[in-house]
Amino acid sequence: FLLLKILLIICVMFLIFSFVYGIARTNDISMKPAIKDSDLVLYYRLDKNFVSGDVVVFKKNNRIMMSRVVAVAGDQVDITKDGLMINGAVQISQDIYSDTTQFKDGTDFPLTVGQGQVFVLGDNRTVASDSRIYGCLNINDIKGKAIAVIRTRGI
């Protein structure tokens, strides 16, 4: 009877982590300092209503990546000498320590985020691979919204 309970718990946990939640490990420093290299991120798969500030987990070029949503459908995004502008307003964040600049062979600005898309940037703007390179993300390509970070340094 105990074995049956254990098997049931394992099956329930498998279903929960297959369809409701997911865990991803970071492999870069694009989201530093919020998420550091080798941290584990618990994400929620079912919420597809993203807002500016959400950290999302997605797959791009066969790599699991994480970035912060900075613009949603209908928003106009521009990167100028003044920095990141959303709908004509300069965006300033206490958690971003470097300037937001365009990449030479990246996305053309200004752009308007399309329906069913979001524009994402890594917090570590100087090294992040984000929408400045590959454009807006389709919401269907996003695995989920980060809800917790588990630090693994020293483990």
Describe the residue ranges of each PLM region:
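Protein maturation boundaries and topogenic segments
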Residues: F1-M65, L137-I155
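Short, conserved secondary-structure segments in the cores of folded domains
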Residues: S30-M31, L46, S67, K81, ...
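Extracytoplasmic/periplasmic/luminal assembly and interaction segments
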Residues: K48-I86, Q91
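Beta-strand-rich cores of mature extracytoplasmic or soluble domains
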Residues: D105-I155
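Structural motif
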Residues: S38-D39, D54, D75, Q117, ...
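PP2C/PPM family metal-dependent serine/threonine protein phosphatase catalytic domain
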Residues: N87-D105
